């Protein structure tokens, strides 16, 4: 049986306009007060000046009703307008601010007219609401909330289904924090649907279009797994299948797919509080669909006893697991009973913190460069190092993207900033995107970039920069760390690429659900996937699909090229779950180019440290497919060298990424026959030569390798396997730019700097490209590369970059140039003066001067 939310009709006011702040009443049609059983009008407009006909619990009634307009001298009172009718109204904040709580319930009365209306303002919390309740049975017939504004707005209610029934009004205030109050006035009946005019809204500032009072219009909540699938809204041609649901899976916080397409799922039961050592209850399950019907038929409990596990990824003979303070690797062996641990978890990294248990290390994925990437939230402060390394190798992170190399055992902060990113992916050109919460939602993450932050200050993202700016950071007691390597010389940061938002309000989603629902659903996002599956319609190729928690849907953004980066355009939502409890946390491709989605599924939508507030009994995994083709069985781990290489130009990123990682594993493992000559022998005609210089024009390229993404995949594979030489890279860079892609040149620059010191020949090419290359993408990668070079090495490159006046209006380049330039100015005021003479970008001239005069 479906658990339906209370059904009601909520009609918005007609034309909305600005209100004269000197007025104390809203223009409204004449209404009729409800009457009691003895025929006397009830005090539902408070014009008796007291609370007769109302019954209170708690201290909600203290000091009520309020008389007259809002006191402009009270806290936050300046400019506030109540929009009340008559002299008296219920003003939940006016006497004692947000402290009082309780309920205020009217005497029951009969519905004598087909329509009713009232005014409501105050908070948008579920715990600050006005309800119309049936006297018999106590069923809530209607519920409305404010929109975090003191100005009350009219709500019109269709009561025709309840004619001649007895109902009562109940004002509920269970919240004591910000906007923890209700404003209410003037409940009356109407013979016809009333039309209101001259009503203010929270968005009706000068020059802005006013927003109507939103309705809480999510169709369902608390559905069973089977009902949840039926409730979804999908585009034509798509279908959703329940792959697994409770009791088979509960609290799925992270998942990955192995080389056989099996799902490895982390169930997190310890959140929101890390348990004492040895008391963790999180576990890893493995699901397999052997008949291709989109539903699991084999389930294995792989590992139990993890503590605050938050991320997982397959690779190098096991699974990488994030469980603060550790990055773990659990080796896997195959048995008749399913996959089992082949040994104890190996601790690879230490120092991940958990001050905020919903902002920890999360959403692992393999980058195109062969590193394991992850995200990290802003209100958790980690000091990370490789296990066994000295404290002088710790790197601080409290917002951003990090990466770990599986064979070189290195940890790096890739980019710094944003808020609580919980979703990361790469497009066909290897460009990194994340989603964020609270602040704008979409960012193109560039190596060495510093980004808008929800809170806190920018920090040094490398050990070298931390030693230069905050050398005593490394001398503290990291058992109780307090110091952060804050850098005061950033001056500004990179902003969102999105040209839109998915929520109303300033920063927090302070409006009701429907106001944000029209534009995307809300500020809380989790999970991001760049669709590169190859089996969905072409219109989805390259689009970014991200989960929206408050909006119970999957949003879609379209990254369109502009300058050195992208603009994120809004596209229609891909999927709406129509279920308030749905909270998807990530989505990933499968071997057929369809998509799996994990759903935490919980009535409690926002983070709270109160563990009992979370429902531990449920969780879902859905499969979203296009068409009716059955799932195929794969095992890429059994493919030989030639067949693995043949997967690289696939249009399905699941296949190309897994094939590349397997090749990386086997070369790293010194498997006989997996070397450069063997790779050269098995690559299709011309592509190996094309990327190593001997086929400069690509005349003999196999058809599959004529696309830039396919060429990049080969380039990344050669690098990840260690089979791409310095000479290969230099030959590629030395070609005329019209014979190579700007993306190939850009990636050659990044990969040459992976080992920090690319060599004098490469540095000379960098300086030449900085001066002459026509591509802003190449210049962007050079700016990133400079941050991995010494002051002396980067100087000629920076001098050439900052002379590009055409880059002054680019979204990324002026600030990326500054991040590369700042250490030069810090090293020598004379150098700063020389750079001023070369800089053709006004922002850089300003920042160079500012840094020269800083203490």
Locate each region found by the language model.
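N-terminal pre-domain segments of enzymes
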Residues: 24-60, 65, 190-233
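Extracellular glycan-recognition surfaces and repeat-rich motifs
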Residues: 50-89
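Short beta-strands within extracellular/lumenal beta-sheet-rich domains
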Residues: 87-113, 126-128, 152-155
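Extended extracellular/luminal ectodomain segments enriched in beta-structured repeat modules
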Residues: 99, 109-117, 164-166, 539
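Extracellular carbohydrate recognition and processing domains
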Residues: 133-167, 172-179
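Extracellular carbohydrate recognition
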Residues: 175-191, 197
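Beta-propeller domains with acidic blade repeats across secreted/periplasmic ectodomains
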Residues: 205-646, 654-657, 661-664, 669
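Long, ordered, helix-rich scaffold segments
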Residues: 598, 611-619, 623-855
């Amino acid at each position: 049986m479906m658990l339906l939310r209370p059904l009601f009709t909520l009609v918005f006011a007609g034309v909305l306009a600005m209100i004269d702040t000197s007025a104390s009443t809203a223009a409204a049609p004449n209404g009729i007060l409800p009457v009691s059983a003895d025929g006397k009008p009830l005090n539902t407009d408070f014009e008796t000046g007291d609370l007769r006909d109302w019954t209170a619990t708690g201290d909600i009634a203290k000091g009520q009703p309020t008389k007259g307009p809002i006191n402009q001298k009270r806290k936050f009172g300046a400019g506030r307008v109540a929009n009340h009718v008559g002299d008296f109204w219920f003003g939940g904040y006016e006497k004692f601010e947000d402290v009082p709580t309780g309920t205020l319930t009217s005497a029951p009365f009969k519905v004598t007219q087909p329509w009713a209306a009232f005014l409501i303002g105050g908070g948008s919390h579920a715990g600050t609401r006005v309800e119309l309740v049936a006297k018999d049975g106590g069923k809530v017939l209607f519920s409305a909330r404010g929109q975090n504004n003191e100005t009350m707005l009219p709500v019109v209610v269709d009561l025709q289904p309840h004619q001649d029934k007895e109902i009562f009004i109940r004002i509920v205030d269970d919240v004591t924090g910000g906007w923890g109050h209700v404003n209410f006035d003037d409940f009356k009946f109407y013979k016809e649907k009333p039309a209101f005019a001259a009503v203010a809204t929270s968005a009706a500032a000068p020059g802005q279009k006013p927003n109507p009072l939103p309705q809480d219009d999510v169709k369902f909540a608390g559905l069973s797994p089977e009902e949840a699938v039926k409730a979804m809204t999908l585009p034509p041609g798509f279908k959703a299948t329940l792959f697994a649901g409770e009791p088979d899976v509960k609290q799925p916080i992270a998942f990955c797919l192995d080389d056989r397409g099996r799902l490895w799922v982390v169930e997190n039961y310890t959140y929101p509080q890390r348990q004492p050592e040895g008391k963790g209850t999180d576990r890893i399950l493995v699901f397999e669909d052997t008949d291709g019907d989109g539903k699991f038929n084999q389930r294995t409990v792989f590992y139990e006893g993890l503590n605050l596990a938050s991320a997982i990824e397959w690779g190098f003979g096991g699974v990488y697991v994030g469980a603060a303070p550790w990055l773990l690797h659990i080796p896997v062996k195959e048995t008749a009973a399913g996959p089992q641990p082949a040994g104890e978890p190996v601790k690879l990294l230490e120092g991940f913190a958990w001050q905020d248990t919903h902002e920890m290390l999360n959403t692992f994925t393999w980058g195109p460069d062969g590193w394991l990437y992850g995200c990290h939230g802003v209100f958790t402060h980690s000091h990370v190092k490789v296990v066994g390394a000295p404290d002088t190798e710790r790197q601080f992170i409290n917002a951003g993207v990090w990466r770990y190399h599986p064979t070189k055992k290195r940890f790096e902060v890739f980019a710094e900033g944003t808020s609580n990113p919980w979703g990361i992916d790469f497009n066909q050109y290897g460009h990194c995107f994340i989603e964020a919460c609270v602040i704008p939602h979409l960012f193109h993450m560039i190596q060495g970039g510093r980004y808008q932050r929800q809170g806190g200050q920018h920090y040094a993202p490398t050990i070298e920069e931390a030693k230069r700016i905050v050398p005593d950071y490394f001398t503290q007691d990291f058992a109780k760390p307090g110091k952060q390597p804050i850098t005061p010389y950033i001056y500004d940061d990179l902003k969102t690429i999105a040209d839109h938002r998915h929520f109303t309000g300033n920063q927090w989603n302070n409006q009701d659900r429907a106001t944000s629902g029209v534009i995307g659903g809300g500020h809380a996002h989790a999970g991001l996937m760049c669709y590169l599956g190859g089996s969905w319609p072409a219109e989805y190729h390259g689009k970014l699909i991200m989960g929206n928690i408050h909006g119970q849907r999957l949003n879609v953004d379209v990254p369109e090229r502009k300058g050195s980066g992208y603009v994120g355009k809004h596209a229609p939502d891909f999927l709406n779950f129509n279920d308030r409890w749905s909270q998807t946390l990530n989505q990933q491709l499968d071997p057929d180019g369809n998509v799996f989605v994990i759903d935490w599924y919980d009535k409690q939508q926002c983070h709270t440290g109160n563990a009992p507030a979370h429902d531990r009994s449920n969780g879902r995994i859905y499969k979203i497919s296009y068409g009716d083709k059955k799932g195929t069985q794969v095992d890429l781990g059994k493919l030989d060298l030639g067949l693995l290489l043949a997967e690289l130009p696939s249009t399905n990123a699941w296949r190309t990424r897994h094939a590349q990682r397997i090749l990386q594993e086997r070369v790293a493992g010194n498997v006989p026959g997996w070397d450069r000559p063997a790779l050269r022998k098995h690559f299709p005609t011309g592509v190996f030569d094309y990327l190593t210089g001997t086929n400069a024009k690509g005349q003999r390229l196999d058809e599959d390798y004529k696309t830039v993404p396919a060429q990049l995949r080969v380039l990344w594979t050669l690098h990840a396997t260690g089979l791409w030489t310095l000479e290969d890279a230099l030959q590629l860079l030395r070609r005329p730019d019209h014979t190579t892609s700007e993306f190939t040149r850009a990636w050659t620059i990044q990969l040459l700097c992976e080992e920090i010191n690319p060599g004098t020949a490469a540095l000379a090419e960098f300086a030449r490209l900085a001066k002459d290359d026509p591509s802003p993408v190449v210049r962007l990668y050079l700016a990133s590369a400079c941050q991995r070079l010494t002051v002396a090495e980067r100087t000629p490159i920076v001098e050439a970059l900052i002379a590009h006046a055409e880059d002054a209006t680019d979204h990324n380049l002026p600030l990326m140039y500054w991040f590369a330039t700042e250490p030069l100015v810090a090293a020598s005021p004379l150098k700063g003066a020389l750079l001023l003479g070369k800089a053709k970008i006004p922002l850089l001239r300003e920042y160079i001067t500012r840094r020269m005069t800083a203490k």
